[in-house]
UniProtKB/Swiss-Prot annotation:
Family: Belongs to the MtrC family.
Gene Ontology molecular functions: tetrahydromethanopterin S-methyltransferase activity
Entry keyword S-adenosyl-L-methionine: no
NCBIfam families: mtrC
Annotated S-S bridges: none
Organism: Methanothermobacter thermautotrophicus (strain ATCC 29096 / DSM 1053 / JCM 10044 / NBRC 100330 / Delta H) (Methanobacterium thermoautotrophicum)
Name this polypeptide is given: Tetrahydromethanopterin S-methyltransferase subunit C
Length: 267
């Protein structure tokens, strides 16, 4: 059971597949951001959603070793690490080809995630066996999701474009909050004895797509494809959220929309 401090419940989708989805989908979307001024930002945003789903699953695995109180903490910490990795990766253009920037950002974020996790185990004495692996994954997912949405806003993943359209405008602060909530909220909302991976990841898709819709609005005046990003994000959010609600109804013992639950003797 996921809140029994003994690790996550069974997984319908192997973590290796979700990692592949996050890394391949995330990087693919980022690199495709420049193929077309209108379609490119949509690809970048979809890549960010792939990374968010990967990160949400990693949160699910690592946070299942406690009562769930550390879900927001590791979420904010890991997205901070991811942003540091992204900025450092973008800055690598001074020594490496611009094409390498997203990969460098991902690698740096994951390395920093491992370092922070090791410090957490050695100094804070956190007894979570998969802390290093999951912190690295969440940090990497955060890096790709932030860079994906940044590319969607700026229309490109290059340092100059992101610096001008995302960092200088202050949108990077909003992306920090937005991506943290998108990654950590699914398990935070679904945790409990009956939590399961499928329902949690349906909510992760929902939070990812609503974040995509918001990222599209941030691109108003910055790229011509902002409206399509918001439209696709909003439509996909409706589908994902309806799927999550349906799954919740199917697995609930009963549903009550308002008022107090009846006492046992009144049933």
């Amino acid at each position: 059971m996921s809140v029994a401090a003994g690790g996550p419940a069974g997984a319908a989708i192997p973590e290796s597949r979700l990692m592949a989805l996050g890394i391949i989908g995330g990087l693919g979307g980022i690199y495709a951001s420049t193929v077309n001024p209108v379609i490119g930002p949509v690809f970048a945003s979809l890549g960010a959603v792939c990374a968010i789903i990967w990160g949400a699953d990693a949160i699910r695995r690592v946070a299942s070793y406690g009562l769930g109180t550390g879900v927001p903490s590791i979420g904010y910490m890991s997205v901070s690490i991811g942003i540091v990795g992204v900025v450092a990766g973008l800055a690598s253009v001074f020594t490496l080809p611009a094409l390498a920037a997203p990969v460098v950002g991902l690698i740096l974020a994951m390395i920093l995630g491992v370092v922070v996790a090791v410090l957490g185990k050695k100094i804070v004495k956190m007894k979570i066996p998969i802390l290093e692996k999951c912190t690295a994954e969440i940090s990497g997912a955060a890096a790709l999701s932030v860079l994906g949405f940044s590319a969607a806003i700026a229309g490109s993943y290059t340092m100059q474009a992101v610096l001008t359209s995302v960092i200088a405008t202050g949108f990077i602060g909003l992306l920090f909050i937005l991506n943290t909530m998108a990654i950590q909220h699914p398990f935070n909302a679904c945790l409990g004895p009956n939590e399961n991976q499928t329902r949690t990841l349906k909510l992760a898709a929902s939070t990812g797509f609503i974040s995509m819709a918001i990222a599209g609005l941030l691109g108003i005046g910055l790229n011509p494809g902002w409206w399509l990003v918001s439209l696709v994000g909003a439509l996909c959010w409706v589908v994902a959220f309806k799927s999550f609600v349906s799954a919740s109804f199917e697995e609930a013992a009963s549903v009550k929309w308002s008022g107090l639950w009846p006492k046992e003797e009144e049933q």
